[in-house]
């Protein structure tokens, strides 16, 4: 997603709505009784109309200026950003992958995936690697023991990705001092870890109340929880289990690859994994009947995960959660990369979609 386009839209919208418009109205009111009131009124109308036109054009360019990924199998459609309300999150491209024979095997299950720009086309991603979702999905769609399915790829919020994907209720259970510390943490010299207040509840609500109804109404899909799944990696893994457990009546399962259990990049004295586990323990006790897939490697960023995933596994093992509904896989020697996730993508998809 082009953050410059998104930010431009918001700057124009908010500047126009609160400052730009009110500023001209104040000027106008102050000279309303003057000799030139009619001329000023006409000028103001022209300026406001121009602002509205700029807003409309800029909204459209969120979609138009973002290159469409190329796929080697199936076909890809980009949703019209103006067809969705986007009342809860910033507009961004959303791509829908369809099997080559769509809609012959309708109704289809739906996999909602995060980090949509990284899913299909390595030439479009920031690091020139991709999940190669189209290739794996096309192969699985040919198997009789797998539900036919489509994939909805939601592009992320760029600099605000961490704020959008960090599970909100666990975050809010941290002490005020720890929350403040996280908001002050720098990801790099120029970028904060959390670019804005954590808003993953809004993101999850967007998927459930804005995006899913649109997909259900415009594509030949099954709409029940047994055919609705969510999936992501790293921070996308966190938001996947969180969304599925917040909406267990909507999602039948979540796949969480290389789940970023630390929540930040601190290795010592980090309370975040503990609040995640406390949240999970409460949800597990509710027996939500949701499939949960976890995996991890042991190289690069994944080297942080083995002991943390082990604690999560113990929660499930100690509970009476249906053992057929969750599984964890360890991939020795694998790193925190799209190519590693692409290699094993068939495993979580099979777990979720097995007939």
Question: What positions do the PLM features span?
Answer:
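Residues at secondary-structure transition points
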Residues: 21, 25, 29, 57-58, ...
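Bacterial N-terminal signal peptides
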Residues: 44-56
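Boundary at the C-terminal end of the N-terminal hydrophobic targeting segment
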Residues: 59-64
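Non-catalytic cap/lid and distal C-terminal segments of serine-dependent acyl enzymes
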Residues: 65-355
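Bacterial N-terminal signal peptides that target proteins for export
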Residues: 8, 12, 16-47
